[in-house]
């Protein structure tokens, strides 16, 4: 059962902990909780000559996320040699810094602007309807597996198009495997150890294969007329008016945009549907809102804009179980944070999860309470599911459109209830907080009541569920 976060003292001790840095990748959330409890807003872990710095307050989040001269981004820690495919496929927007990043973001901003979102709406609806074809009343679904596969199809279609859906889906699957391999070896760039180095050669081979497949896609895709709008077509259009967008750079952009979008959005779907299943009264309210405002089989853009409570549900899900639990910057020049001097090369971790669970920022922070969004308006550095500052996720509007549209379609047709004796585990892997077990739920017709069904698992260490949702032994402990 999760510790009472509100009882954690925030008065800092000396901010440096001399202990194994491997504690962080083994259990990032618990490690950060302990550091925050012990040291307050800033902490440093030291082991021999290695250091990891952590910031846990909105003000320090702001300093790290706005000072792009002192703190550089490195989306993937393992870049490969300068002439390697690994270097090229990791050279997109998310790995750029300084003037290069500003120029690229300016070129790409129209690709993800709100004015293009209506063009993606039919694809989002179509793929969600495909998902729901097998969601018959009484059937049991594994929300974890289904949302990962759903977002693999969705991200592939929106980024690469539906004209050759099979190839786009396979390319998306290839990128997904490559992302996982990066995690396997990438932590060694932050925390040295032989276990992080053994798969490096395999990663380089995967990058070669991935680059070749992306170039094949470019060849197929360029100069075609496409059934539906997609990001790659818009990237080619931007390339035609900018000499800065070579095919090599587009390869990096396409790879990293997919990597950033796929699993984070899949986890947001899984957690939101799980939280609704565990809070039947909220499920009933949001389903009622959808039924009241969505009159056809598909929600229109105007109808989606009227779903205020659904928006609150999504915001609260991303607060209490943020798919991006933490991220990091690398110190680029000597800098001081809260009196702590940091040298170039030092990783600095900031945590959405810890910030979102601070009781001085959010009342009862470990509870899922969508109604809090009626009265609160947190700053961008207090609530940052998509990051903040000049590097805030460029695809945030598209991600929100996907989530809101798909959830409206799902809730229009059904509700969900957890199956008996389910175990739900969550863990941070490669900065992302996602399910590591099945999330087994039963499909209930839209008009019927649902009930809270107790679940087991480490989910209770991450979020405070209603007392009815706790197994009997945990109810007694509570």
Where are the language model's segments positioned?
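Cytochrome P450 substrate-recognition site 1
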Residues: 2-22, 30-119, 130, 147, ...
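Cytochrome P450 heme-thiolate monooxygenase catalytic core
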Residues: 2-9, 73-81, 85, 100, ...
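Cytochrome P450 I-helix active-site segment
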Residues: 10-15, 125, 173-177, 226-231, ...
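Conserved cytochrome P450 K-helix E-x-x-R motif and the immediately C-terminal K′/meander segment
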Residues: 20-40, 212, 216, 297-338, ...
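Cytochrome P450 proximal C-terminal region
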Residues: 36, 128, 174-176, 291-296, ...
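Conserved cytochrome P450 K-helix/beta-meander segment immediately N-terminal to the heme-binding cysteine loop
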Residues: 67-70, 350-376, 456-459
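Cytochrome P450 heme-thiolate "Cys pocket" and heme-binding signature region
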Residues: 89-90, 255, 260, 298-302, ...
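Cytochrome P450 catalytic-core helices
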Residues: 262-289, 397-412
């Amino acid at each position: 059962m999760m510790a009472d976060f509100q009882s954690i003292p925030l008065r800092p001790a000396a901010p440096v902990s001399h202990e194994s840095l491997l504690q962080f990748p083994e259990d990032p959330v618990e490690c950060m909780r302990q550091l925050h409890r012990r040291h307050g807003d800033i902490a440093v872990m030291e082991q021999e000559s290695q250091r990891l710095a952590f910031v846990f307050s909105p003000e320090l989040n702001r300093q790290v996320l706005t000072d792009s001269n002192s703190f550089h981004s490195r989306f993937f820690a393992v870049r490969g040699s300068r002439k390697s495919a690994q270097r090229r496929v990791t050279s997109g927007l998310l790995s750029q810094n300084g003037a290069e990043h500003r120029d690229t973001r300016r070129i790409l901003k129209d690709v993800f602007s709100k004015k293009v979102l209506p063009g993606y709406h039919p694809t989002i609806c179509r793929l969600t309807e495909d998902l729901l074809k097998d969601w018959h009343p009484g059937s049991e679904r594994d929300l974890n597996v289904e949302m990962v596969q759903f977002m693999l199809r969705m991200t592939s279609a929106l980024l690469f198009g539906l004209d050759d859906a099979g190839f786009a889906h396979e390319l998306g699957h290839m990128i997904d495997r490559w992302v996982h391999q990066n995690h396997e070896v990438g932590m060694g760039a932050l925390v040295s150890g032989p276990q992080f180095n053994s798969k490096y050669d395999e990663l380089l081979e995967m990058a070669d294969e991935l680059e070749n497949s992306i170039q094949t896609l470019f060849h197929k895709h360029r100069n075609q007329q496409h059934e539906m709008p997609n990001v790659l077509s818009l990237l080619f259009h931007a390339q035609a008016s900018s000499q800065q967008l070579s095919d090599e750079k587009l390869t990096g952009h396409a790879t990293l945009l997919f990597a950033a979008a796929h699993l984070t959005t899949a986890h947001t779907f899984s957690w939101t549907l799980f939280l609704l299943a565990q809070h039947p009264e909220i499920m009933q309210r949001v389903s009622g809102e959808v039924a009241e405002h969505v009159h056809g089989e598909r929600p229109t853009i105007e109808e989606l804009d009227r779903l205020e409570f659904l928006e609150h549900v999504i915001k609260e899900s991303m607060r209490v179980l943020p798919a991006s639990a933490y991220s990091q910057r690398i110190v680029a020049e000597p800098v001081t944070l809260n009196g702590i001097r940091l040298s170039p090369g030092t990783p600095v971790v900031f945590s959405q999860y810890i910030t979102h669970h601070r009781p001085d920022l959010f009342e009862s922070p470990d509870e899922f309470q969508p109604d809090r969004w009626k009265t609160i308006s947190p700053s961008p550095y207090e609530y940052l599911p998509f990051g903040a500052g000049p590097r805030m996720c460029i695809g945030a509007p598209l991600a929100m459109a996907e989530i809101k549209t798909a959830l409206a379609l799902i809730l229009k047709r059904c509700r969900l209830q957890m199956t008996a004796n389910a175990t739900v585990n969550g863990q941070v892997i490669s900065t992302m907080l996602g399910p590591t077990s099945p999330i087994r739920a039963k499909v209930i017709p839209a008009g019927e009541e649902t009930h809270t069904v107790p679940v087991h698992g480490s989910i209770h260490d991450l979020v405070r569920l209603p007392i009815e949702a706790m197994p009997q032994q945990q109810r007694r402990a509570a």
